[in-house]
C-alpha cells in the first residue's frame, strides 16, 4: 500500500499515546517514509508519505515491480484524486492520470486486465471561450472570490460537488471486450473475476 497522510496518522496515534514506528515494529510491518526505503527484492511494502503530491508514476512502477514477481498474478487498485475545488490542481492531476494510464498500458503484459473507471463524475465544465485569452484567465481571482468553491470564469465553471451522469469505463487485456455500452458498476467486478479465471456468485434476488 502506498499513500499519503503520515502527519495525520502520526498525530492521531499520538493522541492515543501510541507511536507509529513502535506500532509498525510490533506488527512486524515497517511503515516506510518514501519510495527509496523499499528494499530491493521486496514483494510487498507499506509506504505512508507526508503529502498527497507525490509522483504517481513512480508509485505504480515500484508497485508493479513488486507484484509482478508473484507467479499467481496480482490485483492492484490505483486511486487518484481529481475531485478538488482547486481547478488548476484538478486539471493537472487529470493530465497526470492520463499519462500514467498510457504508460501503464504499455508496461503490463497482454495477460493482464487493465480497467479504468471513476466512482462518480464531478461538476467541472468548459462552457466556451474566445480566441486569444488563455483558457484559465482570471481563475485565481475567481477562486479567491468564490463562495463555497463555486468558480465562474469566461470559459469554465465549477461547482464543488458530484454530478449524476454516467462515467467512462474502459479496459484492455483479458475480458476487455466485455466492457462497453451501459453497464452496472457491479458488472465490472464480474469482469475482474473472470480475468482471474474465477466465477462470481450470482447476484442475490431483488426483493
PLM feature spans:
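A post-motif C-terminal structural segment
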Residues: 1-206
Amino acid at each position: 500500500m502506498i499513500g499519503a497522510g503520515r502527519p495525520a496518522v502520526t498525530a492521531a496515534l499520538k493522541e492515543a499515546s501510541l507511536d507509529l514506528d513502535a506500532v509498525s515494529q510490533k506488527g512486524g510491518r515497517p511503515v516506510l517514509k518514501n519510495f527509496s526505503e523499499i528494499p530491493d527484492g521486496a514483494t510487498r511494502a507499506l509506504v505512508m508519505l507526508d503529502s498527497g503530491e507525490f509522483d504517481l508514476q513512480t508509485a505504480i512502477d515500484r508497485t508493479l515491480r513488486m507484484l509482478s514477481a508473484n507467479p499467481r498474478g496480482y490485483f492492484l487498485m490505483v486511486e487518484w484524486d481529481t475531485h478538488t475545488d482547486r481547478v488548476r490542481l484538478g486539471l493537472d492531476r487529470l493530465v497526470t492520470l492520463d499519462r500514467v494510464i498510457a504508460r501503464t498500458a504499455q508496461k503490463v503484459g497482454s495477460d493482464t486486465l487493465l480497467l479504468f473507471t471513476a466512482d462518480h463524475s464531478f461538476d467541472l465544465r468548459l462552457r466556451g471561450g474566445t480566441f486569444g485569452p488563455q483558457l484559465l484567465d482570471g481563475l485565481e481571482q475567481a477562486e479567491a472570490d468564490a463562495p463555497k468553491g463555486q468558480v465562474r470564469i469566461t470559459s469554465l465553471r465549477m461547482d464543488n460537488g458530484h454530478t449524476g451522469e454516467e462515467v467512462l469505463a474502459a479496459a484492455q487485456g483479458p475480458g476487455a471486450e466485455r466492457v462497453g455500452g451501459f453497464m452496472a458498476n457491479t458488472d465490472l467486478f464480474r469482469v475482474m473475476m473472470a480475468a482471474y479465471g474465477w466465477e462470481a456468485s450470482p447476484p442475490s434476488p431483488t426483493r
